[in-house]
Amino acid sequence: MPYTPHTPEEIRQMLDVIGVKSIDDLFAEIPPEMQPRSFDIPEGMSEMEVCARIQRMAAKNRIDLVSYLGAGFYDHHIPKAVDNLVSRGEFYTAYTPYQPEASQGTLQAIFEYQTAVCRLMEMEVANASVYDGGSAIFEAMMMAARATRRSKLVIDEALSPIYRTMLASYTSNLNMELVTVAHNEGRSDKQALMDAVDDKCAAVVVQNPNFFGAVDDFTELFTHARSCNALGVISVYPVMQSVLKTPGEMGADIAVADGQSLGMPLSFGGPYLGIMTCTKKLARQIPGRIAGRTKDVDGKTGYVLTLQAREQHIRRAKATSNICSNQALCALRAIIHMCLTGPEGLVRTAELSMERAHYAADRLTALPGVSLLHDAPFCNEFALRLPVSAYDVVDRLVNHGVVPGFPLGGYYAGMDDVLLVACTEKHSFEQIGIMAELVGGML
């Protein structure tokens, strides 16, 4: 049966109310020569026919490829229990838990998520999430601008180009000055970043590991920023925070991340999760929901949304953002994933991913003309210079069922021969060996 939202009788009643005889009368102001004579719309199909057509379209997707794509989004193992638990009816909603008396389960889950990401980052305050890693970076910049009353922002070019494009778009009409400091062959130029930070700067924004996979320590940079009354903002890879120096240890004021690696499948680009944490001093500047723990009149532990005067449903004109229910369901996936994996499991995931990546780097750099882009330490992702176009290598290997990495020529000038390769615990040594042999056969 077709789904018809309005019956002929209902349409007739609506036309009578507005005083016209037919639907065509609604378009009478359009000159006849501009009105379409007909619409090139195919005949309707039955439900079975629609399903068959969609299946034929879906069959064009390649799901059998062994992929070494990363660039901020990684194919980590997700315990099967995550899907089962997050799909429970008590949780499966986008509703914001304004009513604590009816939302204790959801509020406690958000509180536990905030606690977990604060421990992971070694920061003091977390919100209930924002949309993704890029929006988290933007919100961090806005926090810095509000807190310092300054408009200059220093951006490391080794920050994800996806994020940098978003920042340029979001700030294009906000009278903010974005100063981009060039990278040095894939490494962050910390001295140049320090030179760019002055008493007019609101924040310096970096990433660790950076887009090229290089791991760094920004403690000195953040100390310098603090001496200029500017803030230190860092974007991180959540899984690798289990083995790397944390934002809190470096002295960052705001730490953000894309939480995709904590239980979110790649899913053609989303939905993902924006993680935001900060120091207690900036708690009233952070956007979005914050769940807090308290005691009720009977002395029982309860959970509520707190510091709500920051939010648009309380002070619309002066709100820190227009974030509403945001990615609460994705945040729930993240906390379930972290609880099922545990601290030791997260460390093991990072170690296995690093082990695979370093094996892949050794195999690939043994090929003639192939070298690492930089000599910085790396975790599970690294950039290679090839003796041929990286795009050509990818195009040819896809025909063999392998995506060997992410070509960087479209994002960085002079890098048509650079390939970004990422490994996770899901890649076997055998798969990596086959990929290396295929690359070698095309050089």
Swiss-Prot record:
> What superkingdom heads the lineage?
Bacteria
Q: Does the keyword Oxidoreductase apply?
A: yes
Could you give a GO molecular-function term held by this entry? glycine dehydrogenase (decarboxylating) activity
Annotated catalysed reactions: N(6)-[(R)-lipoyl]-L-lysyl-[glycine-cleavage complex H protein] + glycine + H(+) = N(6)-[(R)-S(8)-aminomethyldihydrolipoyl]-L-lysyl-[glycine-cleavage complex H protein] + CO2
Keyword Thylakoid (UniProt): no
EC number(s) of the enzyme? 1.4.4.2
A GO BP entry is: nucleoside metabolic process
Q: Which UniProt keywords apply?
A: Oxidoreductase
> What InterPro entries has UniProt attached to this entry?
GcvPA (IPR023010), GDC-P_N (IPR049315), PyrdxlP-dep_Trfase (IPR015424), PyrdxlP-dep_Trfase_major (IPR015421), PyrdxlP-dep_Trfase_small (IPR015422)
PANTHER family linked: GLYCINE CLEAVAGE SYSTEM P-PROTEIN (PTHR42806), GLYCINE DEHYDROGENASE (DECARBOXYLATING) (PTHR42806:SF1)
Q: What does this protein do?
A: The glycine cleavage system catalyzes the degradation of glycine. The P protein binds the alpha-amino group of glycine through its pyridoxal phosphate cofactor; CO(2) is released and the remaining methylamine moiety is then transferred to the lipoamide cofactor of the H protein.
For this protein, the record's NCBIfam families field holds:
PRK00451.1
Report quaternary structure and partners: The glycine cleavage system is composed of four proteins: P, T, L and H. In this organism, the P 'protein' is a heterodimer of two subunits.
Instruction: Family membership, please give it.
Output: Belongs to the GcvP family. N-terminal subunit subfamily.
- Protein's name according to its UniProt entry: Probable glycine dehydrogenase (decarboxylating) subunit 1
